[in-house]
Amino acid sequence: MHMKIKKFKKIKKKSKILVKAKLIAQQVENNREEYSALSIEDLRIRTDYLVDGLAKDKFTLEDIIVDALSIAREIIYREHGMLAYEVQMMGAYVVHTGDFAEMYTGEGKSLTLLLVSFVNALTKRGVHIVTVNEYLVERDALFAQKAFEKLGITVGYNTSKLSKATKKEMFARDITYTTNSELGFDYLKDNMVRDINEKVIRELFFVIVDEADSVLIDEARTPLIISGQPKEDFSLYLDIDKFVGSLAEDDYKIDNESNTIALTDQGVSKAEKFFNLTNLYSVESAEIVHKITNSLVAHYIFANGKEYLVKDDKIYLVDQFTGRVLEGRSYNAGLQQAIQAKERVTIEPENVVMATITYQSFFRLYEKLSGVSGTAMTEAEEFLKIYNMVVVRIPTNKPVARIDKQDYIFGTKRVKWNHVIQEIVNRHETGQPILVGTASVTDSEIIHERLTELKIPHEVLNARDNTKEAEIVKHAGEKGAITISTNMAGRGTDIKVSDEIRELGGLYVIGTERHESRRIDNQLRGRTGRQGDPGESRFFTSLEDALFKRFATDRFEKASQKLEEEFYDSRFFSKMLDRTQKKVEGLNFDIRKNLMDYDHVLSLQRELIYKQRDQILLKTNNLNIINNMIDDYVETEILNFKNNDNTSLVDANKIVAFLNEKILKFSYFTPATFANMPILLAIDKAISIIKKVVDVKCKILEKINGLNVIDEILLVNLDQKWTTHIDKMTKLREGVNLRSLEQRSPLNIYIEDGNNLFERMKINVVTDTITSICNLSLPNEMIEITNALDEFVNSEEFKKKNYGNQREIEQNFNSALSFSGSATSEFDNFIESELENTLIEETPEEYVEVEEYIPQQTEPEVVETETTPYGFEIPKYDTSGTDKYELNNGSSEVNILENESDIFENSFSQIQNTFNTEELDPQETPHTAKADDQFVFESANLEDDIEEIENVSNIDKAPEIQQPLSEEEIQKILDMPAFKDDEKPLTIGNYLDNILDSMDIDYDQDKEITQQLEPSSNEQEVTANIPEQNQLDITTSDIDNEIELLDESERESIKEEIQKSISFDLSNDPDFIEYRNSVFVNKNNGIDYSDYKKLNEDESDDDIKAFYKLPKVDKKEPGTLFGGNLLKKTPFNFKNKNELDNEKIKSTNLFREENQASEQELNTLLQLDDEKDRLEKINQLLNKEDPEVLERKELERQVEFETPVYYLEDIPEGESLDNFKAMDNPHEEQSFEDNLVDEENQQLEFEEALDEVIDDGQFNDEVEAAELSEEVLEEVINPNPEELSEEDKWLITKKEHEKFMEKYLGDVKELTSENPEVVTALLQEKNKNLKDVEIIENNEELENTNEEEPNINSQDSFLNNIKIIKTVDKESEDETEIIQEINQPAEIHNLQKDILDYLKENNKK
């Protein structure tokens, strides 16, 4: 069979993406005047309209991109005074399209992310912004929150300190800032939960990765691992550490290029002697070999201060790319224990992997992935192949003025350090600030010690102490500052310089060693010369640096001869460094690509497991899942019960023993029931019997409310078997390279064996689940099962299950037998089409052949046939050739490994390349989320100036197979514009090599330095041309020139693509105008809450199904293991309950404030006989605004809108809004002006009457002023209490207030002065998240305390609404000041009550 060659359509050049971005940015700039004239309310209305239109599919994000960017730009400018540059809007557009924007350091990437996150947040599906540390997460989230929440776009952040409930609330917001590791671990924990409501992440819609090259490239080799269930045995570690420590250099060999280590023959002999072994590499010694390998790495490859730190009797990992300590991480597979033994710290038990995922697999789960960084062009090919992102370089806002000088090369580190210190001293004397970048903590401490000896002040920022990171970096640009730092990638704080420093030449950056990647060097250089500032950089390297030792050994001797005590900065050494770095980058890419290929197999299995867990957690279809499992279980078991004399019949004794002993646990069936029964019919009957038994058990459980036991059994068995499967897959991965002697690709072997392991895991899950259910001991189960079986076995349905369908059964069975181990499971169907195209290595033939199934297996030979009693022939196969794994251990004996779990669990060549780290779950609580794999594997590259490939939109379909191409078709392919004349392939094989491997695209823009440089002395400085890779020479004017160079058709093509985005005019859109006129608008609120949905706390199954919007499916689905409804949407698409409740409270308060008290409230007040109840009701009414303020608001509202305002709370239950509007409105009986005159007269009359009552002394001081009797109201205020106006009532409360305060205020002051700790204690009790006591004003800061917003009408609400803006002190006078600020009678009353209750509880007088 031959693979059909995909003809990729021609698409635009990379520069055309920039052209489109600039046209969009220009249109946003054109809208500046219009949007700057809008009020906040107008911006909010436009935002709400865009949200509503997207939800109803009126338009797409592409249509409204210009207006959305205009809104975001304007609100950010108003709140922060920062107006986005044109280049930032261009970057936002590139990121929005799902590509990679390379923005030079200091060009405002954070603001760019704000713009694009707002645009995509309009979908209300959640935007995740990933940054490199938690400090930046909180800083940027608060920055965004201030601007966007005024427009109804919520912003949250996710850090390791947050509780699970808070994380869930944060992820429910429209924009969530998080770190990459925390996001990945939350995803894994979500897929280990036992309750679906414990999941914190909603759908994986759109993620923007800041410093994406660091996250997606540098950290791609480090899987995220959650471990648990520790293994107890670690006694061998100290013995092995002692042995490894005694080895000589001849006993082991280090491959510097791959950074691996292994014992030599001499070392193997020593090991066998030390451990008293006959053969070190026998299967029995596998564990010892594994631990020796780890110990070799710990002793001779890893070093304290570089890969890890020893602190407080613990091992802390160090991020090799940023120099930060990786909190909560540890090496897995025993390497952590080997390091602990080496450093003589406490050895912790080795852990079992419970969940794992790589960043490559995780981020491809998102529907849309994009990234930004200052250095990505060198890895453009990898971003395209792995993540399907085109790297687009964004022009700088101002020309780059930094000077990158030629490297200084030294022969030894000793000479290098001397020159580095001398350079620092010389520059420090001029006052120029200096930033020194080192590759390790050890190097930074060497410079620190030397400068300390010279008494030169400086700051050190490394993994040992990074608590003051932001502060240190902030002052690094001041005069005379010297900052020594490990890798500066992702530090996130701009180093700003003053005019004085600019005169001195700006910040001077010294690199003390070239890194493995040119990107890391460029990131260090990029710390100076931001936004057109002057700056300078130079690297000091020696031939003893790690980069030379590992990767330039062939040139080391030649280079050493050129250097003695002097240094050179010649073209020879510069080119050697560049070639060496390119070599390392290529090697690392191969490692990451290899890791991705292997991880893709596991990720497909992971997706099926996680989807199945979701089905179980939903609890809507678990009985159907059980029934599917029974089908698989019975068939697997009973196929082993063939009659020895006639294999087409079942062995009656075996099947009876199976049913009575394993299923029923009591004797019921006899061999006569299954005598002379064909095995396939026996399977059918046994399935019916077991389903009936399980059905009876479920009915019993339902009676005792125990159906959740079934759910728990399903989850426990699935989780346990999945954990075991991960462990087996890890061992298979580590040992698969040892089987290369089979003359097969290790990857193909891994695919085949991994698939077999997964099939075995499924069988084990089914077996253990059904067995566990049948083993449940329930009340009266024997009687009920017996009665049910009697009825079922004697039924006509059971008796009529004759052999009428035997032909169909046997034909299906024959067909099933024919594959003999071929991939036919749901899992295989799910992954085969992808594996064929993406994972199977290409053959070197001219035509690429793809086997129809994976793994490739030979169909067994038919040796004979048998005839059934019903005349059908069943073939018998020769199964003697069943695969077993053979391992030649070097002895004459060949060990047979019966299953994959016995394969070597050690790796002699791979463990050092992928030093996995893991996060230990301290609670060991099993934690699931939708695992939609949006894996898009692009099998072609993008020619830099030629074309991009078409996205692969359907990865589930198998490739089409067709006959070899004709010469004419081949010629058409060769004539495609994707190839230049000199790149035309000669054969189809070459063509596929170019498409599937590489077009030799040179994304590296390095210019060769042709200037010959002579050796220079300390006094002489040599300046070379700046390499193009270190500067952004593209400007916006270049893009204009590019547009001019385009022909008319190309120009029109670009404009046509974005015409809809540019021409969309929101202001003149008829739908928007209608929306604006119809929507309820108020200066304080512009939201209609009628469309919001929420789930009640006690959700029913129907609620959950509606929430997930699941289809009704009763049969197996191809996306799961055992069936169930396939998830179509991820949970938590709606706002969380707290947010909805808060919005409801705000809406209710608005109604109460605008309408004051309702007639019903007033009548209730007047009819209360009990004085205490009446006082409480009045206190509630007093929690309202001044009536004069309300009157003014009402006047403004009426004048502005000239129509009555209807509130949701006004509408009776079941009544429509239109009908409600048609009702009589009492406020419309008179004109507004007439009402004002009448109300004014009533107020004057009322005030006079009330003053007379007070002056006559009708109020008794002994009686609290608020307790107005019904008689007083009737006699003084109005002869008819029911006609009392709202204004009169408010005047009553105003007068009450003055009298009320005099008595209560004194009582409370006295209580608090005698017990000064009371207020503080009460406040801390109400808000446990505050250490001292942070006073909250008007609930504006309440969200930061993670507390629900209180109901303002609740009696204890006062303590959450104190109107003081300072921290509570323990001093009594400060507390007195607090009380004086409280000016509401209801608050005083509640405070006094709370204080008295507190004193009573604490037995104080």
From Swiss-Prot:
The record ties this protein, via InterPro entries, to: Helicase_ATP-bd (IPR014001), Helicase_C-like (IPR001650), P-loop_NTPase (IPR027417), SecA (IPR000185), SecA_DEAD (IPR011115), SecA_motor_DEAD (IPR014018), SecA_preprotein_X-link_dom (IPR011130), SecA_SF2_C (IPR044722)
What cellular-component terms does GO give this entry? cell envelope Sec protein transport complex; cytosol; plasma membrane
The domain of life is: Bacteria
List localization entries: Cell membrane; Cytoplasm
Q: Name one GO biological process term.
A: protein targeting
Annotated region (Protein translocase subunit SecA), positions in chain: 1-1099
Positions binding ATP in this chain are 88, 106-110, 494
Known EC number: 7.4.2.8
Catalytic reactions of this protein? ATP + H2O + cellular proteinSide 1 = ADP + phosphate + cellular proteinSide 2
- According to its UniProt record, this protein's enzyme class is translocase
Molecular function in Gene Ontology: ATP binding; protein-exporting ATPase activity
- Keyword set for this entry? ATP-binding, Cell membrane, Cytoplasm, Membrane, Nucleotide-binding, Protein transport, Translocase, Translocation, Transport
Q: Is Zinc among the key words of this record? A: no
Task: Explain the purpose of this protein.
Answer: Part of the Sec protein translocase complex. Interacts with the SecYEG preprotein conducting channel. Has a central role in coupling the hydrolysis of ATP to the transfer of proteins into and across the cell membrane, serving as an ATP-driven molecular motor driving the stepwise translocation of polypeptide chains across the membrane.
Q: How does it assemble?
A: Monomer and homodimer. Part of the essential Sec protein translocation apparatus which comprises SecA, SecYEG and auxiliary proteins SecDF. Other proteins may also be involved.
The similarity annotation says:
Belongs to the SecA family.
Q: What is this protein called?
A: Protein translocase subunit SecA
What's the source species for this entry?
Answer: Malacoplasma penetrans (strain HF-2) (Mycoplasma penetrans)
The gene that this protein is the product of is secA
